[in-house]
Amino acid sequence: QRFGAGGLATVAQSGIDLALWDLKGKLMDQPVYSLIGGPCREKALCYVTSDDLDWSIELGFKHFKVSNPAHYDMGIDGLNLVEEKIASAREIVGNNSELMYNPVMSFNVEFAIRMAERLKPYGLRWLEEPLIPTDLEGHIELRKAINWVPLATGEDHHGRWTFRQLVENRAVDVLQPDLKWCGGLSEALKIYAIGEAAGIITIPHAAAASPWGQHFAISMPESPMAEFWMGSDPGIPLEELCPIPGMPMPKDGYIKPSDAPGFGMEIKEEWIIPWDHSDASNNTGKR
């Protein structure tokens, strides 16, 4: 608390928390999903974040999120640019796929309302993180102004208190904590409980692209999809780009986490570089 309920202190807490969950699972010889209630589904449905929609479809994904080409200061040109992109995306993926759009904090309230109006015909599943996370009043105003598209946010909100404010003010429809930034799996479970009590779903940021997110997605009933952020170029199989040894990759639009102890990561001890404690000790008390 001394370092605040969010920001870098919470990000640091996240790494420690995830490591402790992995350790607990290994000590108990159980996958982490068994320690947080067990699986509620055989495999988790994924959506992919990528602008390479043809390649994403070829890989078996059925639901999609695209990036943002505009900032609010672009005015009418920005509106036209985004509508052109979303119209093209909808044509490619068809009407039987969920389509999401992420402005990544690039809008103010006025521009977000205009954009939501423009994108009405394309049946977006949600509009993601249009405003900066500190603008609670803006989120409240925006949610009241548009009722035809759900609002999602949370990857840059840190700690359960910021999510509680969103939920208490009914300023959001989808909570998106990032387990590496929000405080870890322990904090994400508390955020999930806050949302669940209010009838709000939680779909963590990039869950399908991390072991901890995969375990969350398979265990939480009110988490109907898991995001897979695809950083690969077209033609490169996902298995060749797996960032963490032992982590499963999506198949046919679904993800199933490892059932190995902990998060199932295969980290070799020789990869870990010991920290030189003497350097820190020698600087103790120095200003």
Tell me what each language-model feature is:
Residues E42-T49, F64-V66, S97-P103, L127-E128, ...:
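Hydrophobic faces of well-ordered beta-strands that scaffold small-molecule active sites
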Residues Q1-M100, V104-S106, I113-P121, L238-R287:
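N-terminal capping/lid subdomain adjacent to the active-site entrance of alpha/beta enzymes
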Residues E117, G123, T134-Y254, S258-P261:
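Shared catalytic-loop signature of beta/alpha-barrel
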Residues G7-T10, E129, P204-A207:
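Periplasmic-binding protein-like
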